[in-house]
Amino acid sequence: MKYVELNLFPEEEEETQKSSDSKWNNKYTSDKGKEYNSDKGNEYSSDESNKYDFTNLFERLSKSAFRSRFHLSQKDREYIAEKGLATIRKHAEDFVTKRLAPAIIPNDGKQTPMRGHPVFIAQHATGCCCRGCFFKWHHIPAGRQLTREEQQYAVAVLMAWIEKHYS
């Protein structure tokens, strides 16, 4: 499998300082209790309780023949190792904002490729690939713009799945 280099993420080209008006909370807590800071790419333990508990969700997803067939390939793992989880999280934020969050998505149900990026794999594995699946698995209705909190939730789901399957 070959990854297509898209210049969708100019922040990878050069390190920039965090702007004070950032729309994202740059920390997330995985289902394993680890916190990640996307500005620094550092992983550190947290005593703080998790904001989300994905145990029930991942249990339900594991019972789906379609959802449970998705796994990270060796190329996906190498890509994550090369870019780092903080960068992968930024990609997830961007994909959620552009492909899942809008109220009207002209190609809804077909907007997420089945391969080519670890986040795409995670989107299909977690039911965050289109608004129909997002409603079915996460009970967040289509036909309206996702709130900032709902977008952060989707990113947290994706990153928890990636971390679980990467380690």
Across the structure, where does each feature detected by a protein language model lie?
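Short terminal or interdomain "cap/linker" segment that borders an active site or interface and mediates
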Residues: 160-167
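The feature represents the first ordered module of a protein
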Residues: 58-111
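Short, hydrophobic/amphipathic alpha-helical patches that form generic packing surfaces
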Residues: 90-98, 132-136, 160
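Iron-sulfur (Fe-S) cluster-binding segments and ferredoxin-like electron-carrier domains
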Residues: 132-158
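Alpha-helix boundary/N-cap detector
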Residues: 49-52, 83, 87, 125, ...
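Immediate flanking context of iron-sulfur cluster ligation sites
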Residues: 106-126
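N-terminal leader/targeting peptides and immediately adjacent processing regions
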Residues: 1-71
